[in-house]
Every structure is written in structure tokens, then in C-alpha cells.
Amino acid sequence: MMNSKPKYKLTDKDFNQINRRSLFGFQLGWNYERMQNTGYLFLILPQLRKIYGDNTPELQEMMKTHVQFFNTSNFFNTIITGIDLAIEENEGVEGKDTVTGLKVGLMGPFAAIGDSIFAALIPTIFGALAASMASQGNPVGVFIWIAAQIAICFFRWKQLRFAYDKGV
């Protein structure tokens, strides 16, 4: 019989690890069949091991759940991750269907919103500002571009903890 209620609570160190993995490794395992599935599992595997234990049937079951099709915006993936981990931490394997529904229900809308705003709109606006200023010999545009990118990274870093706290 599977252990239904995990006892591990995520720490700031866990959140920092997930954020680093999200920024630098989320797309590394991208493939045409299931897109970001391996990247998603890569983000949360250390925490899944802490929640379910190493080499347990629960861990294996949840790993199979997390390698299903997944594709969303790189800018919003940690919102889904935070909510997912909050559910798994509270419900364990019993929350498997909830986690699957969450991922399926949010990945499409977050892909559309995140990519439209953070991959198209913001780079276009700040890139145009930076290019216009640079063409006039003004280096301030470059710093505006850098500040915008830092703000985006800060947003990405903070949304994981926010989603986790509000997730259940």
C-alpha cells in the first residue's frame, strides 16, 4: 500500500534549486513527442525524492505522471510547478489526478499569455527603445534593456514561491 501523506516540507533551498534548474535547464530535454516533459521532471525530481523517498513506488508513479506531454511558456512554468508541488506535498500520490488536471488545464493558457507578453511584447518594446537610443549614440538604452531582463528574471524567481504558497 502506498504512503498517502508525505511529511517533507519544501524549504527556501528547494525553491532556489528549482528556480536555477528552471532558468538553465528547463528546455534541455525538449523533444517533439512530449516537448518539455523531461525538463519539467528535471525541475522537480530532487523535491519529488524528498517528498516520496528514493526508489519508492510512489516516486516511480509520480515520475511516470510527470513525463506525460507538457508544453508551456518558459516564463510561467514555475507557477504550475509551485502549485503542483504544494498539491503533492499535501496529498501525495492521491493528488495525482489533480496534478495531471492542473498541468493540462494551465499549460495552454500560460503558454499563450507568457509567450505573448514575455517573449514577444516586452522584448519588442524594450528592444526598440534600446535600438533607437543606441542609433543616436545613447548607451542608456542598453541599460534599459538589461533592467527589463533583470525584472523578468526577478518575476520568474518570485512566482514559484507565490504559487506554492497559494497552491492549496
Question: Where would I find each of the regions flagged by the language model?
Answer:
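Extended aliphatic helical segments
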Residues: 67, 93, 99, 104, ...
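Short alpha-helical linear motifs
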Residues: 83-91, 105, 124-127, 166-168
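Transmembrane alpha-helical segments and their cytosolic interface motifs
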Residues: 98-132
